[in-house]
Amino acid sequence: VTDAAFPTTGYLAWQFSQIIAGRLERALRAEDLTLAQHNALQQVLWTPGVSAAEIARRSGITAQSMGAAVSQLVERGLLRREPHPTSRRSMRLFATAEGGAVAARATSIARRIERETTSPLSPDDKDSIHRLLYRLVEELNPDALAIDTRSLNQS
């Protein structure tokens, strides 16, 4: 790819991100979730006890936006807050049973959207894109990948 190439890689990545986000946002309405709420639920399941501020860092959105999403999930009974044992200013987040069930359905929705949007690609191409995106995120926002993998093995 030359410097003069259009569309640029960044433009293509942004377009694909917009396509997935739009489709996922529409599909998540079935669970009455926004993208931020879906992300918060997933992050809490991946790392039980995580704070809203940490989820915001991982997600690349403002603490205020994530705080609003988390508050709505708490009000719906999908998440619960507990005081942090060593920090009076921080609250730890945990999923309720209902939150886990909603997250499982939302994950199925997200996987379906991913299958649909990547259907033109071969399995090898899908693996390549996943590997390359993982490397980029690992380099540019390692917090996004800072999850407790023990919680993944329990699911």
Identify the function of each model-found stretch:
Residues 8, 12, 19, 23, ...:
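Pre-recognition alpha-helix immediately N-terminal to the DNA-recognition helix
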Residues 17, 42-46, 107, 134:
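Short, locally clustered residues in the helix-turn-helix/winged-helix DNA-binding domain
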Residues 21, 71-138:
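Charged, amphipathic alpha-helical coiled-coil/dimerization segments
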Residues 43, 58, 76:
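Residues within the alpha-helical elements of helix-turn-helix
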Residues 47-51:
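Short capping segments at the starts of secondary-structure elements
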Residues 52-53, 64, 71, 91:
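Residues within helix-turn-helix
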